[in-house]
Amino acid sequence: MPSTSPAARAAVDDLALSTDIIVGFPGETEDDFTRTLEVVAELDYDSAYTFIYSSRPGTEAATMADQDVPPEVVAERFARLRVVVERTAVARHRARIGRVEEVAVEGPSRKDPSVLTGRTDQNKLVHFASPTPLRVGTYATVRVTDAASHFLFGELVDLVAPATHRTRIPVASA
């Protein structure tokens, strides 16, 4: 299966790609899982929401209990997937260090109320200090100073005047 990621990234400036992945679906083979790892590495996702399969009554998969993947195999695969996902997410986030991002303020951080939290237009979580409290919904420009797999750190540059027009970005689904 050829990758559409390079073409999509070439067509849309500053595109962020994310996905949801379930590990351990009934009947999943080692080959299936290996291919999942290859696709995740190839598509270079900015983020991936990863889950361990759990049976849901009333679904077709719930009737496939005879094909359940052993829990120890699922746990090992999930750990391997997390390594690939974290590596690509950190690399993509580190590439943003030094950039100035527009951030919509969501409020104070749960861990440190002196730090504000907000999101970029790519839905990247950003933690940054502000000399004064900012209201939820305020837009600020923030220079990215550091990166982790699930969020960015930054410093406040300026407040952004309320926008009179925002461009809607089309969302494609596979």
Model-predicted segments: where are they?
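Terminal RNA-binding accessory module
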Residues: 61-174
